[in-house]
Amino acid sequence: MTQTYADFHRRSLDERDAFWAEQARRIDWQTPPQQVCDASNPPFARWFVGGTTNLCHNAVDRHAATRPGDRALIWVSTEVNQERVYSFAALQAEVEAMAAMLVAQGIEPGDRVLIYMPMIPEAAFAMLACARIGAIHSVVFGGFASVSLASRIDDATPKLVISADAGSRAGKRIAYKPLLDEAISLAGHKPAHVLMVDRGLAPFERVAGRDLDYAELRARHWGQPVPCTWLESNTPSYTLYTSGTTGKPKGVQRDVGGYAVALAASMDWIFGGRAGETYFSTSDIGWVVGHSYIVYGPLIAGMATLMYEGTPVNPDAAVLWRLVEKYRVTVMFSAPTAVRVLKKHDAALLKRHDLSSLRALFLAGEPLDEPTARWIADGLNVPVIDNYWQTETGWPLLTVAHHIPGVEAVPTRLGSPGVPMYGYDVKLLDEHTGATLDGPDQKGVLVMAHPLPPGALQTVWGDDERFVNTYWGSVPSRQVYSTFDWATRDADGYTFILGRTDDVINVAGHRLGTREIEECISGHPAVAEVAVVGVADPLKGQVALAFAVPRETPATPEAALALEGQIMKRVDQQLGAVARPSRVFFVSLLPKTRSGKLLRRALQAVAEGRDPGDLTTLDDPTALAQVKTLLHK
């Protein structure tokens, strides 16, 4: 008899330990867990306590033992026109060789290894090699600016950095080594070694005694067996930095066992992936989707994972569909921004290739608007499934799960990412009182009750206090995990995400702290004060707009344009091009309350052409009038 999804979800909360004990059987354990969940020290939670396992074993070795010739990793680069296919046996050989290199450099369980690489197979080998030996990897998005990279080096204190000479995007080469060398010179912590993969794209200087050549060490260590190190389930597996509202980066810390179990269940129940099939996520390993659904998730499920270096429109706007046809992709994961880019091109390109293998397209990273969802669903003629989650959660928090045996499928609803997934105790709360909002269409903060399910963050790396205060201390009188997103829920239980409650904006799926951008801009000698807000953009979801008060008003329009260019260049250099505001407007004052608090939401509303609402606390009405005039020039 089929049960409703609501009943299934309720059981995952009411019979938590029994529910997750069943899911734990999806992976291999060297020693079985002694306790499913230790929630005795809220808000912390420990999953599968006492069990020992290994992410690399579950992703690679166990499949190599039974299906050595099956495809595991498919790498395609339209940037350098190369394709490589690795079987599970070949992938294990590459991972063991890299693990041997790390061990030879003195890397031990618990040591940190920072990975600053483009979308190349060696990046996946590096992550899996760290997992194999119990080192904690910290992947930083390739091409990240030196100042940002330096702050992550100081926070993670890696013994070793793995990098490459260059990445490439839309035909433009981005040299990584100068950025990395500058970051290390800026950082207080100095890694002992830098392991360099030389792609032959950009010449670089080697630092004697520090820099190591990957090809040379690979040849030296090839064929050297390195067994998996069995790790207690709650051992940290990796840290991944996410934007916060303050300048210091937040390292989301993930465990080993809970993460493996959560991914195994999600690959089956949410994505419907099957061993032997091909999964294609267009994300990057620098983001959480790349960790969960390029590297670990598909491989744990025994699928081939397609790793793509390139854009959705190079060499043409049919490139993704060509790959779906060639590699018989069954499940695809992308972002609404990528679809909006494709939407600018002829819809006939969607029909050019045989897409009969494709069962579903999942989209996440930013809100999915209805026109975009309809366009791609009509073009592909497969289900398009929105899903909402965060770096912190590690796997989808809201979506629709269509592959749970004996449980009725919840239909998709345009505009909503879906319903709470199993294991997540999701609530909407009043931000001022902490009261639970049970009625339909009430706006509240989207939160989760303790304990978070397996796969979610354990803590903030090296800063338990920040974990408790930031995530669990923002709602009055309630110790709940805040997503910092506004949401409503309709009468059928579908959640609708309304936007951020804090000052993080979402540009094409990249989460950026507005205050981080403000700090960068205010460091320019010509700028007295600045406010950055995220405004809706039809292509990127949101873009950053900066409103700066200059120390001296630019004398001419040309001078203003030159100063705007300098500010943008500064952001590029310190934070990376992804953080660059689309415009910098110069104003004589910013809209503030009489107590000096910046009226950020009013500024954002005016920038988006909306009613700014109650302005009774506004000190000087000319501030917003000035902004309106500038925007409508």
Regions found by a protein language model. Give the residues of each.
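Conserved ANL (AMP-binding/adenylate-forming) active-site segment centered on the GW(Y/F)…HTG consensus within
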Residues: V410-L414, P454-F484, T501-D502, T514, ...
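Structural core segment of the AMP-binding/adenylate-forming
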Residues: L128, R132-E216, A335-P336
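Conserved pre-ATP/AMP-binding loop-to-beta segment of ANL
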Residues: G69-R71, V194-V197, L201, E205-Y241, ...
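Conserved AMP-binding/adenylation subdomain of ANL enzymes
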Residues: A260-T278, V288-T330, K344-A347
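Conserved beta-loop-beta connector loops within the AMP-binding
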Residues: G423, K427-H450, A491-D492, A555-E564, ...
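Conserved ATP/PPi-binding loop(s) of AMP-dependent carboxylate-activating enzymes
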Residues: V419-G423, G434-W472, L512, D611-P612
